[in-house]
Amino acid sequence: LLALTMKGGIIMIPLLLLSVMAIYVFFERWSAIRKAAKADNTFMARIKDYIHEGDIASARNLCKKTDTPYARLIEKGISRLGRPMNDVLVAIENTGNIEIAKLEKNFPWLATTAAGAPMIGFLGTVSGMVRAFFNMAEAGGSADISTLSGGIYEALVTTVAGLVVGIIAMFAYNYLVTL
């Protein structure tokens, strides 16, 4: 498999880098999203109890100690208590947008890899075919299948590699956006 991969030529280097980056981004984001999604079933009950008791400081402290996007939204809302309801809602919405942006960090890299890797693979296809025809022209009238095979190998290997990397990145991206 390594020998076949090496026949893809220099185009395989960016494809390898994109695949490593896509795998890293997928697992890093998957881990971050899972961590953010962990819910403490008693969190809201304790917040409500603190608020009903008038202990706003304890409610805010609980939010600050609970490292989740949900807790940060609640904390922002609590910090705006006593202000007009629209101010509270806008503050929570802004915090929600910030939290979503944090969770979606590096998603564009996966989307770009999903779209770009096949294009890079097709670039390898074109360069491989150019090489095959160049070799055939250099051989003159004595060209045989071995003269063409190096370029054709490069063309096919880079096409497959680009498609594989792109497809994996696309599925990884789509999986993450549905979590």
Kindly label every feature range from the protein language model.
Residues 1-42, 176:
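Hydrophobic membrane-targeting segments
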Residues 7-12, 99, 103-117, 151-162:
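Loop-to-transmembrane-helix entry motif
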Residues 9, 23, 59, 74, ...:
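Residue-level signature of catalytic and energy-coupling elements of molecular machines
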Residues 12-25, 111-118, 165-169:
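Alpha-helical transmembrane segments of integral membrane proteins
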Residues 18-21, 27-28, 117-120, 127, ...:
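Residue-level micro-sites within transmembrane alpha helices that shape
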Residues 37-123, 127-141, 171-179:
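Predominantly long cytosolic amphipathic alpha-helical stalk/bundle segments
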Residues 144-179:
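Channel- or pocket-lining gating/hinge segments that regulate access to a cavity or pore
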